[in-house]
């Protein structure tokens, strides 16, 4: 099958199109013919050898999330799964390919009427956004700051916070991303490349700051957002687009009673992890969640997809199409 290999850590050019053996399902596995591959920012870090979760052994076919059709199953798996439209995590690798073997227990059916590409777009980002919104306990009337608001997770967080009746401040960089945040319905839009962006947030909130921060950037942006968090507010660390987590060790957190929350608290058990995926698919099928698929690339152009994400040129979700 066609696949994309990572033979050595490096820039986007380290992703090399090639061939891989056709996968054969082992016991408890299913083979999926891939129609869409979810590409995440973390995968660009993995490719560069800077994974926050530990680097894989090379060579490897990257990719941790796919959507497609089950074409075969191994021993112990219901034959009725063959032909089903599904999304699935892959166990950390193997997704950048035409076919991939996955654990049958990780396969989640795609609701009737929902496009597989849309389903793939919410596999990771929808699961994460719903989990983070629930974790933060976003309530009607609260001010919510979403960093990286035009990204895959951020654009969904904006939608979910608005659905809860919150007043949303969307922070992003550049006119295209700010325009998208406005289209999504954000009440206030700020460009955090402006030196006065925090002043704009304080002005919008009457000087009180925000009740909830979804910190998808980290670094200096996250540190500034932490200072904007109101007394008793919630600071949710949801990503590190800057390459580093926000330093939350300062005394101001305790002094102002800010609650620190993070990704590790979202789905602590496999059952909860799966439940969030099902909820994300249901929300997408009903139209309550509308992922922004900003760009798609052919499988063999995975390097271009990574380059777009790293250049901050990507809007919403990026998919590979085999």
Stretches with model-predicted labels:
Residues 1, 271-322:
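C-terminal hydrophobic helical "lid"/dimerization subdomain
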Residues 11-14, 20-67:
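N-terminal glycine-rich beta->alpha transition that marks the start or flank
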Residues 45, 79, 87-150:
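NAD(P)H dinucleotide-binding glycine-rich loop of Rossmann-like/cofactor-binding domains
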Residues 51, 67-92:
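A glycine-/small-residue-rich N-terminal strand-loop-strand element
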Residues 81, 120-194:
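Mid-domain Rossmann-like dinucleotide-binding core that forms the NAD(H)/NADP(H) cofactor-binding site
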Residues 148-149, 217, 240:
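NAD(P)H cofactor-binding loop motif with strongest signal on the N-terminal glycine-rich segment
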Residues 196-207:
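Short amphipathic alpha-helix with an adjacent loop that forms part of the alpha/beta core around
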Residues 220-288, 322:
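Glycine-rich phosphate-binding loop and adjacent beta-alpha segment
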